[in-house]
Amino acid sequence: MISCLSRSGIFWLCCLSACPLVSWAQSPIVRTASGPVQGAIENDLTVFRGLPYAAAPVGEQRWREPQPVQPWSVLRQASTVGASCPQKRGLALEGGGDPGVIDEDCLFLNVFTPRAEAGAKLPVMVWIHGGALIFGSGGLPLYDGSALARRGAVVVTLNYRLGSLGFFTHQALEQERPGGPVNFGLLDQIAALQWVRQNIEAFGGDVTKVTVFGQSAGAQSVLALMASPLAAGLFQGAIAESPYGFPGHTRVKAAATGAAIADAVGLPGASASMDALRRIPAERLSALEGKEVSLNTSFITGDAAVPLPLLETFQQGRQAAVPLIIGSNSDDASVVLAFGIDPAQAMQKLGMGRSAVKAFYPDIKDDRQLGLAMGRDVGFTAFARRITYLHSQKSPTWRYYFSHTGVGAGSTGAGHGAEVPYVMGTIRQCQCLGQPATPLDLAVERRLGDRWFAFAATGKPEGSITWPNDNRGRGVVLDIGDLDTVRPAFMSARLNTIITGLKWAGSRAARE
């Protein structure tokens, strides 16, 4: 999810991309396992948009695992993004851009490649968009993969089922398939990665160098993929930008929410049949997102894709042993403002008195700013540190803190999602709040994109200064500000106290 708050607290509007120079006449044809496709030459790249990686999850296929695409033999033009998955348009406009056409037939991906030919063996970067698992689209201009592709990567962006169409159960579904799948959106992501394994070499990619990366709910998805036995072996590197430490949902809670959803659309709650639930128009379900009857933000624990709570999987060391970059932003908690949450009230709900919180942040006088600072550290910074500690015992792990306050940034720091246009290299297209990118913004964009590409290519985020991996989670951070600065023991005392208070610590070593 993107918030990138301005000083007036307004969310980024969608970054409209400049029209690329497009040619279809000379675009190469790629033969996928499902059939031949032809993209478009955009400037110096070949781009394939709207490629189906799974069959339409409609009718009887709603709330089922993604199914294979029906093969085709006639050349398929792949020059237009596919429909976005059902969502509430107003939320999407505030969190990344207009999703365009919305339809339940939405399981599409896009491929950006500098060399659409088998045997090129380029690193592959698979982007998973954020949006609290209830909105967003892989086809948004903000997520255009061209800049990373020009560095030499094959970039894939994708859609996955959202909201109650993507993460759902109900008494009738539990009876239909006891213990069956409930995290359909995550299964979509896994299906997309399986498509990558099967097809990406034809687009110039190296199937042995696949990195998954995402922001917010996309970062949470990256960690869930690392934790999921169903995704084992489908990728070799991971980047999680601002994942959050919110707990997942149990199947029991999710089923109760499913009953509430049925009731909200006029069906008899827990007694509703699956036939009746599958006949509900998708837009009626999307209209409920962001309300109390919506799950929002987290996965459901207890199916084959998410057998255990995410943090528990990492605590047991059962996650994929792949190199990881993980980090957070200096004003991540500003995202709560989009949902009408008062940071001061949220601080009180944490169960800590103002004086206790004030001791953490003696220089902050305003309760609203105290709430934002505490929310940032509890929801994002401490969680990233905890995951770093746990994963660094298994694989190289690098942690960052994005503090650059550039275009559209708020006075309290870099908002939730502020790093995304720097990573994707779309800052030039973003006339966010009418402010053009500065030379400093472009320098940060270049450094960050170079590091992410280097990680995908080599397994190490090499750059102008050495970024040490955080051996056993001791608190080493790369502060990505106007310059890159390595900070040892970053916020250690405060974060240790938070981790202990949240009972994430587990051992003394985790707090050191």
Predicted regions and their residues:
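Substrate-access "cap/lid" subdomains that shape
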Residues: 95, 191-194, 198, 224, ...
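Alpha/beta-hydrolase fold nucleophile elbow
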Residues: 203-215
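Glycine-rich nucleophile elbow surrounding the catalytic serine of serine-hydrolase chemistry
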Residues: 214-224
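Non-catalytic accessory segments of hydrolases
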Residues: 23-183, 431-451, 457-466, 483-485, ...
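Bacterial N-terminal signal peptides
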Residues: 10-20
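C-terminal subdomain of alpha/beta-hydrolase-fold enzymes, centered on the catalytic histidine
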Residues: 223, 300-512
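Bacterial N-terminal signal peptides that target proteins for export
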Residues: 1-12
